[in-house]
Swiss-Prot record:
<dbReference type="GO" id="GO:0006412">
    <property type="term" value="P:translation"/>
</dbReference>
<comment type="function">
    <text>This protein is located at the 30S-50S ribosomal subunit interface and may play a role in the structure and function of the aminoacyl-tRNA binding site.</text>
</comment>
<keyword id="KW-0687">Ribonucleoprotein</keyword>
<dbReference type="InterPro" id="IPR038657">
    <property type="entry name" value="Ribosomal_bL19_sf"/>
</dbReference>
<dbReference type="Pfam" id="PF01245">
    <property type="entry name" value="Ribosomal_L19"/>
</dbReference>
<dbReference type="GO" id="GO:0022625">
    <property type="term" value="C:cytosolic large ribosomal subunit"/>
</dbReference>
<comment type="similarity">
    <text>Belongs to the bacterial ribosomal protein bL19 family.</text>
</comment>
<protein>
    <recommendedName>
        <fullName>Large ribosomal subunit protein bL19</fullName>
    </recommendedName>
</protein>
<keyword id="KW-0689">Ribosomal protein</keyword>
<dbReference type="InterPro" id="IPR001857">
    <property type="entry name" value="Ribosomal_bL19"/>
</dbReference>
<dbReference type="InterPro" id="IPR008991">
    <property type="entry name" value="Translation_prot_SH3-like_sf"/>
</dbReference>
<dbReference type="InterPro" id="IPR018257">
    <property type="entry name" value="Ribosomal_bL19_CS"/>
</dbReference>
<dbReference type="GO" id="GO:0003735">
    <property type="term" value="F:structural constituent of ribosome"/>
</dbReference>
């Protein structure tokens, strides 16, 4: 076995199997585990998926939302143990792989049409 095959086999054990199908433009709610003292709690983060990168264990999504008039983006490693759950709330209809143009828009211009042909 080559080194790459060994690495892939080890990474395959770490991949999460309960992830939903996530597409660009979807509105998702990501449950992030946060440690406070010796306790853990799950903090939800809701927004629009504007980018997906990499694959396998390094796969990430960038989620954008507007909080108190300021755009906030977070990058989540999909297979990280800090991600408790991901729920797709809405499917978006877009024609781009990266929605970075939303950064320059404000108000109603940031809305994305809903897509009904894919199930949640």
């Amino acid at each position: 076995m080559s080194a790459q095959e060994i690495i892939r086999s080890i990474e395959a054990e770490q991949l999460k199997s309960n992830l939903p199908e996530i597409y660009i433009g979807d509105t998702v709610r990501v449950g992030v585990k946060i440690k406070e003292g010796d306790k853990y709690r799950v903090q939800p983060y809701e927004g629009v998926v504007i980018a997906r990168r990499n694959g396998g264990i390094n796969e990430t999504i960038t989620v954008r939302r507007v909080f108190q008039g300021v755009g906030v983006e977070r990058v989540f490693l999909l297979h990280s143990p800090r991600i408790d759950n991901i729920k797709v709330l809405r499917r978006g209809k877009v024609r781009r792989a990266k929605l970075y143009y939303l950064r320059g828009r404000v108000g109603k211009a940031t809305r994305i049409k809903q897509r009904f042909d894919r199930s949640l």
